[in-house]
């Protein structure tokens, strides 16, 4: 099947790209999604308590405010409903194909097109390929000795078993990150015994979450400018946090203030000094993702809950043995161990010029130009590519910035009748050299921890090291001067002989 634009992934990024393409009059596109429905991470993560840690008004498209958010921080089901409504309102759903897992893509240098294969044997040919798979799509499974021998249930939070009956069971949760602080309070309410296995404590702040009054929602619906103002205020409030992550001497005190707030919250929430010591981080705030929760500490102090800080020696058929020799028996093990975020920017094999594979190019860490294009891979765009995620604000803002850039580039490709456009290697290298210098000064590099922001060697491939408005300014237009633009060969008019036969030329 031939198509102008092929988008892989139907989450916030893929759906947003489809909407903007339609608004630009570029209707010849398809969106391939491996799941049975749209939503991306909000379709995958259905565990109890799943919710966003970015305010609702900001975690949405700027062109489609939702006056009916029920809470300041929306839950998974409400976000998924919002995305489904957007797909219908903007007419993108007919462009979507579900259960189409992409297993490979190869660039045809002769034709200037991408050939994309799916798991079910289909092949799509497209002039432009857009990867919108995001960075939270490949669960990270811990390499624990004996895990396969466990006779109870084992599953990852991103692959939640809706049929799992955990009431009155003995359950272990491995991990204490963003998903754990949401699921632990929910599980603690219904299981017989809950063990939370912690390797490194996280910095936890209270979550400023509450129900949004019906009257407030009504005013937002009636006066759209009020909600836009609320969104702007949330944006500014979160953007102010960015300097605290940059860790330059000028801004160090802001980070220390946040640490004091978190420690005060811990002191007030946890009475037991031994437990409090176990929950006190030994690295700078922001080095790992800051956790927001109002009930995580309370859940850890329930009579049926324990925090285990001894390392896991092995998993046995009946439970877990820790390094201190203790044997823990369980009916189920829940893996709240996050995603391979630093390693999944190439979620399927992508082969560019000369057959070079993107994953192989990135074996020492992903790099791109503005997180969106890669030299050697013409007519290829990424949404939420390398170094476009955030430690302080909404990635939807970044996604929309990239979409603006990509749509402008596609218009350039079509308007100038170009065969290919490809970022110059020297431009990409210079951009990443400056980026590495900025990242080296951030708390993510200097804060004394190793996080999912980094590769195994410590290279930070996920986060943008600055203000989001700087990124948006850089993405406001397609900078064609930094690209190699290859036009189609000029077409010679076919010569027609007297007998009406067409001589070999462009038409042959």
Spell out what each predicted region is.
Residues 141-156, 321-372:
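Central helical "cap/lid" subdomain
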Residues 66-85, 97, 174, 250-257, ...:
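Short beta-strand to alpha-helix junction loop
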Residues 98-113, 306-323:
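A conserved short coil-to-beta-strand element within the FAD-binding core of flavoproteins
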Residues 3-96, 198-199, 268-274:
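Beta1-alpha1 glycine-rich phosphate/pyrophosphate-binding loop at the start
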Residues 2, 6-12, 16-17, 21-24, ...:
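Rossmann-like dinucleotide-binding core of oxidoreductases
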Residues 397-400, 404-508:
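C-terminal active-site-capping segments
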Residues 71-136:
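Feature captures the FAD/FMN-dependent oxidoreductase FAD-binding
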């Amino acid at each position: 099947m031939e198509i102008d634009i092929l988008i892989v992934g139907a989450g916030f990024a893929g759906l947003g790209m489809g909407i903007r393409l339609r608004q630009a009059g570029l209707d010849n596109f398809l969106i391939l999604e491996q799941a049975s429905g749209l939503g991306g991470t909000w379709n995958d993560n259905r565990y109890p308590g799943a919710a966003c840690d970015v305010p609702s008004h900001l975690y949405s498209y700027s062109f489609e405010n939702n006056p009916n958010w029920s809470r300041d921080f929306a839950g998974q089901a409400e976000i998924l409903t919002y995305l489904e409504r957007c797909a219908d309102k903007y007419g993108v759903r007919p462009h979507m194909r579900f259960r189409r897992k992409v297993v490979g893509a190869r660039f045809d240098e002769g034709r200037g097109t991408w050939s994309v294969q799916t798991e079910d044997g289909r092949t799509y040919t497209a002039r432009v390929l857009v990867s919108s798979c995001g960075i939270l799509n490949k669960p990270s499974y811990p390499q624990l000795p004996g895990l396969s021998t466990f006779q109870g249930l084992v599953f990852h939070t991103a692959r939640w078993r809706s049929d799992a009956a955990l009431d009155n069971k003995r359950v272990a949760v491995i991990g204490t990150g963003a998903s754990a602080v949401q699921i632990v309070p929910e599980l603690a309410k219904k299981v017989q015994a809950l063990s939370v296995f912690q390797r490194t404590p996280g910095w936890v702040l209270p979550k400023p979450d509450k129900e949004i009054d019906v009257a407030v929602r009504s005013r937002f619906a009636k006066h759209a400018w009020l909600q836009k103002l609320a969104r702007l205020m949330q944006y500014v409030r979160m953007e102010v946090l960015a300097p605290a992550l940059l860790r330059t001497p000028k801004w160090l005190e802001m980070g220390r203030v946040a640490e004091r707030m978190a420690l005060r919250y811990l002191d007030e929430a946890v009475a037991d000094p031994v437990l409090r010591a176990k929950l006190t981080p030994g690295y700078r705030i922001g080095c790992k993702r800051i956790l927001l929760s109002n009930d995580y500490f309370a859940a850890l102090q329930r009579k049926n809950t324990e925090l285990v800080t001894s390392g896991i020696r092995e998993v046995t058929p009946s439970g877990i043995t820790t390094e201190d020799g203790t044997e823990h028996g369980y009916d189920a093990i829940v893996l709240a161990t996050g995603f391979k975020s630093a390693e999944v920017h190439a979620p399927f094999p992508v082969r560019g010029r000369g057959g070079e594979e993107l994953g192989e190019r990135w074996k020492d860490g992903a790099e791109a130009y503005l997180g969106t294009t890669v030299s050697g891979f013409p007519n290829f765009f990424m949404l939420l590519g390398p170094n476009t995620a955030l430690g302080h604000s909404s990635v939807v803002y970044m996604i929309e910035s990239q979409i603006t850039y990509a749509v402008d580039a596609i218009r350039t490709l079509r308007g100038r009748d170009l065969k290919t456009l490809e970022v110059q290697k020297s431009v990409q290298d210079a951009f990443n050299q400056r980026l590495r210098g900025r990242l080296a000064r951030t708390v993510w590099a200097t804060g004394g921890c190793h996080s999912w922001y980094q590769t195994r060697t410590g290279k930070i491939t996920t986060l943008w090291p600055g203000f989001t408005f700087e990124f948006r300014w850089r993405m406001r237009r397609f900078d064609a001067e930094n690209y190699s633009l290859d036009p189609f060969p000029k077409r010679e008019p076919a010569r027609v002989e007297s007998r009406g036969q067409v001589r070999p030329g462009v038409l042959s």
